[in-house]
Amino acid sequence: MRPEIVLFGDSITAQSFRSGGWGSALADAYSRKADVVVRGYGGYNTRWALFLLHHIFPLGSSSPPVATTIFFGANDAALKGRTSDRQHVPVEEYTDNVRKIVQHLKKCSPTMLIVLITPPPIDEAGRQSYAESIYGEKAMKEPERTNETTGVYAQHCVALAEELGLRCVNLWSKMQETNDWQKKYLSDGLHLTPEGNGVVFDEVSRVFREAWLSPEEMPFDFPHHSHIDGKNPSKAFEERCL
């Protein structure tokens, strides 16, 4: 059985298997080495994600994931009193919720590679333009998310990773290192363009490799075709690669 890598998060994870998505790129990188499984839930915050843990990551599983990315925060950081008020989770609770997710995963497998990913930065003008394109004159004039507030959640995510000894992708900071990141990386001020997906893929791949999960060093699940003798193919299948 192939090892399993689970991508757990909100819509940015749910969309990661679209054309040009970071999840599909990971699946390609680990082709025939590991199964990349997307568990993304659009609109979810960490409070709601807790209800999914025992269903997605059952305790006592004989084959828990070898690695999991936890990518929440964009919805938790929605502002109270604005259009996405229902999704808001205070930053202290967000931090505690992520900690609970990590604790559950560690119970599933003490050796699991767990990677935290911060929410991406927010392009407030882009969010406003998107809202106006959907709601017209009824669009709320005040932003439902701000880059400053989202940055606070990102900082807490990074600090929690350091506290727990986990690896972390600080997407909020990384994307803002590039000029015109707002248009280059974000399609609607929040979700990712193909270029934005590329940043996530590069960073997650880097972290996986820095840990111990390099696809180049993993065996194929079954023999490579070049190892199969056309006259005696059964020999190559006497022992599975995994």
UniProtKB/Swiss-Prot annotation:
Coiled coil: none annotated. GO terms for biological process: lipid catabolic process. Keywords: Hydrolase, Lipid degradation, Lipid metabolism. The active site is at 11 (nucleophile). GO terms for molecular function: hydrolase activity, acting on ester bonds. One of its GO terms (cellular component) is endoplasmic reticulum. Gene3D superfamilies: SGNH hydrolase. Residues 223-242 are annotated as: Disordered. It comes from the Eukaryota. InterPro entries: GDSL, Iah1-like, SGNH_hydro_sf. This is GDSL esterase/lipase At5g62930. It comes from Arabidopsis thaliana (Mouse-ear cress).
